[in-house]
């Protein structure tokens, strides 16, 4: 009986510890439900088999500015970066990459693509209209120099500086969001069918508003490594 109790207690403690490991950190911004849209945790679980906090690669442990936020090219060939789900504003969305400037207020931005589209809950349920159609002249690949770079998105309807993978750049460039600059949640890309991680591939949930549902634009970036 005593051994059974010890075993049961060990299992319980292991379960609690596992749940704690996957829990939201103390300083992590809260993620809001999607307004009449799929919630971010549901998107991650159903499309990638990912845990919203358990698989998060840039959790806020102390300050947003201390989180991993830059990438480096992983191998031969171009880097690809494109939106895969569009749940934000239907005004024109833009995205691209940047090199950190001499100061945080001066990122060297390069635009790659734009689109004016919004997916529906039905699109995600039926896997239709995915990825969103890009505007003419858009590109999803680029050849960065051999140094760390960041990613960004923006929306024309907001008329601000956009949001960046580095929170400190958001705080410096975007006055509207300066007090809540953590706007990108970064994850490994997992193939749902096999359960295996896709090498050098990441999923990013972007937020460019203040409600922090983190699925305004969901992007995939390939042939990169996250700089820790």
Q: Model features per residue range: what roles?
A:
Residues 10, 21-23:
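Small-side-chain structural scaffolding
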Residues 1-7:
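Bacterial N-terminal signal peptides that target proteins for export
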Residues 1, 23-24:
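Initiator methionine at the very start of the polypeptide chain
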Residues 24-199, 205, 215:
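Extracellular distal adhesion/interaction modules in secreted or cell-surface proteins
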Residues 14-20:
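C-terminal segment of classical bacterial N-terminal signal peptides
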Residues 197-228:
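Long, compositionally biased interface segments
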Residues 7-14:
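Hydrophobic helical h-region of N-terminal Sec-dependent signal peptides
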């Amino acid at each position: 009986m005593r051994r059974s109790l010890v075993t049961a207690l060990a299992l319980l403690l292991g379960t609690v510890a596992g749940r704690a490991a996957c829990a939201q950190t103390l300083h992590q911004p809260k993620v809001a439900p999607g307004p009449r849209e799929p919630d971010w945790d549901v998107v991650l679980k159903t499309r990638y088999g990912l845990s919203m906090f358990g698989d998060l690669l840039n959790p806020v442990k102390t300050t947003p500015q201390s989180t991993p936020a830059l990438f480096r090219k992983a191998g031969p060939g171009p880097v690809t970066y494109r939106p895969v789900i569009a749940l934000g504003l239907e005004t024109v969305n833009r995205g691209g990459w940047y090199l950190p400037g001499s100061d945080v207020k001066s990122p060297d931005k390069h635009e790659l693509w734009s689109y004016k589209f919004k997916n529906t809950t039905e699109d995600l349920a039926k896997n239709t209209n995915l990825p969103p159609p890009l505007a003419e002249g858009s590109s999803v690949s680029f050849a960065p120099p051999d140094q760390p770079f960041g990613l960004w998105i923006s929306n024309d309807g907001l008329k601000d500086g956009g949001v960046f993978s580095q929170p400190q750049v958001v705080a410096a460039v975007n006055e509207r969001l300066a007090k809540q600059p953590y706007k990108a949640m970064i994850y490994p890309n997992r193939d749902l069918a096999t359960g295996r991680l896709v090498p050098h591939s990441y999923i990013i949930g972007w937020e460019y508003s203040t409600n922090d549902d983190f699925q305004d634009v969901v992007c995939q970036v390939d042939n990169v490594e996250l700089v820790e």
